[in-house]
Every structure is written in structure tokens, then in C-alpha cells.
């Protein structure tokens, strides 16, 4: 699964340096909690790559601190989960790959 993901990696959107810098500033407040081999996580990561987004990923299977953050903040150890922190510092935990992809496409496409 991971090999197929690497071999068929999607091309990203090409933006002007200024536009990409703006997108990077917006994605600095996003974190994707994942398991590396989860097919739904791979789907979310491919959408992130396709949209040329610089989103931090945390492996909730191998990193105990990430797993505890996910459980404490989101209430479930379910992946993928996108942690969204807004300008006011409020945090939303979004589960389900389809919802995550729709959110990212709506905001950054």
C-alpha cells in the first residue's frame, strides 16, 4: 500500500511563491493524526499532496504522545483526524477522510 502510494504520488498544485506562503501560514495550524498503513489516511495524505499543503502529520500508532493528544483532544483514537486550530485558538477535531478532504478542497483548492 505504501509502495503504491509512493509510486503513484499525485502532483501538487503550482502556486506563486506568495500564494504558497499564504497557504503555508494557514496550514501551520493544522495537524493530521494518522496510522501510516491506514488506507483512509493514505487517501487523506494524497489529497494533501495534490493540494500542495504543508500539514504536519503525527503517527498516532507509533508515537504515544500523539496517541494521547488524539484521545484527550478528539475523544477517540480514530484516524485520520485533522486537528484544526482557528485564529482565536479554538480547536476542532475532524474525523473521516471524506470530510477532511472536502474541508481541505473547499479551503485550499
Where are these regions (language model features)?
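GST-like domain detector, emphasizing the conserved glutathione-binding G-site
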Residues: 1-37, 42-109
Amino acid at each position: 500500500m505504501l509502495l503504491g502510494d509512493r509510486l503513484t504520488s499525485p502532483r501538487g498544485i503550482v502556486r506563486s511563491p506568495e500564494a504558497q506562503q499564504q497557504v503555508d501560514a494557514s496550514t501551520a495550524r493544522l495537524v493530521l493524526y494518522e496510522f501510516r498503513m491506514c488506507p483512509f489516511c493514505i487517501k487523506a495524505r494524497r489529497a494533501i499532496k495534490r493540494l500542495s499543503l504543508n500539514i504536519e502529520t503525527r503517527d498516532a500508532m507509533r508515537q504515544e504522545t500523539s496517541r494521547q493528544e488524539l484521545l484527550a483532544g478528539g475523544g477517540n483514537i480514530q484516524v485520520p483526524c485533522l486537528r484544526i486550530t482557528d485564529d482565536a485558538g479554538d480547536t476542532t477535531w475532524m474525523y473521516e477522510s471524506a470530510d477532511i478532504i472536502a474541508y481541505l478542497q473547499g479551503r485550499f483548492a
